[in-house]
């Protein structure tokens, strides 16, 4: 399995065997770190981290993973990057490609990370775009593998909520690529695009995956092993949009009742974070005062329950990102 010098832009670019190879390497690197016997395989490498969108988990995961492996990083924050403003993506790619061994990009359009990859001459890693979140998918798959006690191709999961963007798109493709039973529970207006659904069905034909899209949240979660969700509204969207989205998605909120509707007493809750699950943030308090909701996409009761594995999931961002970098750059 040769993943050397490979870009990591979206799961559609990889075979099921290649995705599994990343997961196996991540598990191996995680075990080595826990045992204190990690071997540095990226000594002398330098990685540029371009962030057009702010981040906690993605930035920390890339920085810690790189340093664990002996590599250096340069963080280009949103205000410092000239990409697309004073300098074209093509020129930025060619400059950074001369100085760095790899480039991570977290930002808006998928076309930006694809163009970086086209011109950089070094591996480019997608830390998140509007369309895809592939490093999160490796973390999610590793977490499900650790917690399900059975092979991924015998595992079922649901994503409930707004499924139009990177998490809904990516989870649908992940499940299809790995032969899983994947369900999307959302109003039809918030389903992934027809192109993404078609790509998932094409992958499922190869892997035997089962794909379900439904407007019924209870139907989506029936007999699943994992229930995923994500935030319903992005910060900066007007209050009217929040109200409209909350009204549209109220039946898709992850509550103890929805967890119980799975019929699986061992069902686990997953979220890529950050989550609006209580009033302990300025945003959470504003949501409570404005809409009367204590927690939005998930209740505090579920988020803090033993069923919640969100912090295992967050930790696995680092191990899986490390696997992507080691596979591409490691000695």
Swiss-Prot record:
Gene: argF
Alphabetically ordered keywords of this record: Amino-acid biosynthesis, Arginine biosynthesis, Cytoplasm, Transferase
Source organism: Neisseria meningitidis serogroup A / serotype 4A (strain DSM 15465 / Z2491)
Bilayer-spanning residue ranges: none
GO molecular function, one term: amino acid binding
Pfam families tied to this protein: OTCace (PF00185), OTCace_N (PF02729)
Binding site for carbamoyl phosphate: 55-58, 82, 106, 133-136, 272-273, 317
Xref: PANTHER family: ORNITHINE CARBAMOYLTRANSFERASE (PTHR45753:SF2), ORNITHINE CARBAMOYLTRANSFERASE, MITOCHONDRIAL (PTHR45753)
Family that this chain belongs to: Belongs to the aspartate/ornithine carbamoyltransferase superfamily. OTCase family.
Residues the record lists as binding L-ornithine: 166, 230, 234-235
InterPro entries: Asp/Orn_carbamoyltranf_P-bd (IPR006132), Asp/Orn_carbamoylTrfase (IPR006130), Asp/Orn_carbamoylTrfase_sf (IPR036901), Asp_carbamoyltransf_Asp/Orn-bd (IPR006131), Orn/put_carbamltrans (IPR002292), OTCase_ArgI (IPR024904)
Record-given protein name: Ornithine carbamoyltransferase
Cross-referenced SUPFAM superfamilies: Aspartate/ornithine carbamoyltransferase
GO BP: arginine biosynthetic process via ornithine; citrulline biosynthetic process; L-arginine biosynthetic process
Subcellular location(s) of the protein: Cytoplasm
Enzyme Commission code(s) on record: 2.1.3.3
Function: Reversibly catalyzes the transfer of the carbamoyl group from carbamoyl phosphate (CP) to the N(epsilon) atom of ornithine (ORN) to produce L-citrulline.
Pathway(s) this gene product operates in, as recorded in its UniProt entry: Amino-acid biosynthesis; L-arginine biosynthesis; L-arginine from L-ornithine and carbamoyl phosphate: step 1/3
UniProt xrefs under PROSITE patterns: CARBAMOYLTRANSFERASE (PS00097)
Recorded GO CC terms: cytoplasm
Catalytic activity: carbamoyl phosphate + L-ornithine = L-citrulline + phosphate + H(+)
């Amino acid at each position: 399995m040769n993943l050397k010098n490979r870009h990591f832009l979206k799961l559609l670019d990889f075979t099921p065997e290649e995705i599994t190879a990343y997961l196996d390497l991540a598990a191996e690197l995680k075990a080595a770190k826990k045992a204190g016997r990690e071997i540095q395989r990226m000594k002398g490498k330098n990685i540029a981290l371009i962030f057009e969108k702010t981040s906690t988990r993605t930035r920390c995961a890339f920085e810690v993973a790189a340093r664990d492996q002996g590599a250096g990083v340069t963080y280009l924050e949103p205000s410092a990057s000239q990409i697309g403003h004073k300098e074209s993506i093509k020129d930025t790619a060619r400059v950074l490609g001369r100085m760095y061994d790899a480039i991570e990009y977290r930002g808006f359009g998928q076309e930006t990370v694809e163009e970086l990859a086209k011109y950089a001459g070094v591996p480019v890693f997608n830390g998140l775009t509007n369309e895809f979140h592939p490093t999160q998918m490796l973390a999610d798959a590793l977490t499900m593998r650790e917690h399900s006690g059975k092979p991924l191709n015998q595992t079922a999961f649901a994503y409930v909520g707004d499924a139009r963007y990177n998490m809904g798109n990516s989870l649908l493709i992940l499940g299809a690529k790995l032969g899983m039973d994947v369900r999307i529970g959302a109003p039809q207006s918030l389903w992934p695009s027809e192109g993404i659904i078609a790509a998932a069905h094409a992958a499922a034909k190869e892997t035997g995956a089962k794909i379900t899209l439904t407007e019924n949240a209870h139907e989506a979660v029936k007999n699943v092993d994992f229930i995923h969700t994500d935030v319903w509204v992005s910060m900066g969207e007007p209050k009217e949009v929040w109200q409209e989205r909350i009204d549209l998605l109220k039946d898709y909120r992850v509550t103890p009742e929805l967890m119980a509707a799975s019929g699986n007493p061992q069902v686990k809750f997953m979220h890529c974070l950050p989550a609006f699950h209580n009033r302990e943030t300025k945003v959470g308090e504003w949501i409570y005062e404005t809409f009367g909701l204590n927690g939005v996409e998930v209740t505090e009761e579920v988020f803090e329950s033993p069923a919640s594995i969100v912090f295992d999931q967050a930790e696995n961002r680092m191990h899986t990102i490390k696997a992507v970098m080691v596979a591409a750059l490691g000695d």
